[in-house]
Amino acid sequence: MPEIIGSNLEKCILMMVKGSALRHLLKAKSSDSMSNRAQAMKMSSHRKYCSISLALKKFLSRSKLFGISVGTEHISLDKATDRILARNIQCPIDIPPFQRSTVDGYAIRSSAAKGAARNDQVVLNVIDKINAGKDSRAKIRSGEAIAIATGAKIPAGADSVIMIEDVIIEDMRKKIRISHRIDRGSNITPRGGDLRKGQILLKKGTWLTAADIGLIASVGKSRLLVYKKVKVAVLSTGSELAEPGSKLDDASIFDSNRFMLSSMVRKQGGEPIDLGICKDEKSVIRAKINQALKFDVILISGGSSVGEKDYVPGLINEIGKPGIIVSGVAMKPGSPTSLGIANGKPVIVLPGYPVSAFVAFYTFGRPLLYNILKSSGPPVARQVAKLTSNVKLHRGMTTFVRVRILRRHGCFFAKPVSAAGASLLSTLAYSDGIVVAKYNNRGLKREYMLHKGQNVEVVLLREVYQEA
């Protein structure tokens, strides 16, 4: 059902309902759909919206009471991207495990170059060469040097490395001339200079990125203990929905929410379980919800509002206590979102409009999965940008504004795509990010607007490089 925005228009309609004029008008209308729509508007006007912060607090605290646990498993390092560590990882060795050169050059004793100057150069004999991965049995004495590659082990007797660019090479690379002094330890990474044995590399709950996996590989570990993926049942409701790839009739639309939500679940550490499309029939929806209770979390798209065919919240209440704990959230889009617990399983009832469903999962689905996985989640890319136009906010609501990011002369600008149109998935697909604008109702002066030129923080949905 479409979201109904509270406004003066609604108040007028409700006043008319009480008066005879609209009663006679409604009697004159034979269409059941008109009657249903008026009833839905009346019910919506009495709906109290919960703030996002309070709704999330209620939902997560109730979810914790049921102690959802997904267990752990060992996996190979090559499968660890975007998985969550189930225990701390300690460094088993010093990294590097030996002193190594940070440059291509010559390993020497720093004392040998103590008196070197442009007009009083020091000559050293080159006695060996060490490539990365090799060692030298030679021990450097005064007046000697060993050619060394970046990353190679420092030979015995040497305490510094002089860069190849800072020497004069003579006699078929058998001698070098040095014209300046060099400090002890120059161009050398000491043993354990990066990581020390016993050091905590990564903590339990870390969301593993490419850099983390490289770090783990650098200390020789090939298998990890991680949390199992949260199994999330994903169900779309609506008699108008058709499966992508099927033939579309005149009164149907393709189901996009199920695929969008499944993709979001995967990205946020879950394993989506596709329960398909469910027609707007109470008994069928009940059976699907009972099937979904086998899994850890339930996402239901559609049927969250107050229309005649919006059965889902009532069924959640019937199936298991405490049932729906939040009905309606003060956010646009996504205000008809409901949150509940059925037989110990968290349930998010998302609006049928695609943008609303996206925002609702972003707001409640992500934190729920992170909570179950005992993680703060993956890094979130953000960009500060200047608005290119004014944006009107919904009173008493947190507004999620879709924007394009433009880059001009090194500066970033946020161009609003749409503050409305929750049914228009293209406005989300063509956006680079979202501005989360909290309504400020403190004090006598109330701001209903984000202003052109104002700096805003954009939560990026994709990487942005282009220069506009």
Where are each of the predicted segments found?
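Short glycine/threonine-rich loop/turn motifs
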Residues: 5, 252, 258, 267-382
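Short, glycine/charged-enriched hinge/interface segments at domain edges or termini
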Residues: 36-53, 106-274, 279, 418, ...
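Short, low-complexity N-terminal leaders and the immediately following helix N-cap/first helix
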Residues: 2-120, 147, 190, 375-400
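Short alpha-helix capping/helix-loop boundary micro-motifs
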Residues: 93-94, 130-135, 185-190, 435-445
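Conserved active-site and cofactor/substrate-binding residues in soluble primary-metabolism enzymes
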Residues: 47-54, 72-75, 79, 103, ...
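C-terminal terminal segments
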Residues: 34-37, 41-42, 100, 117, ...
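Short beta-strand/loop turn elements enriched in aromatics
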Residues: 68, 73-77, 98-124, 157-173, ...
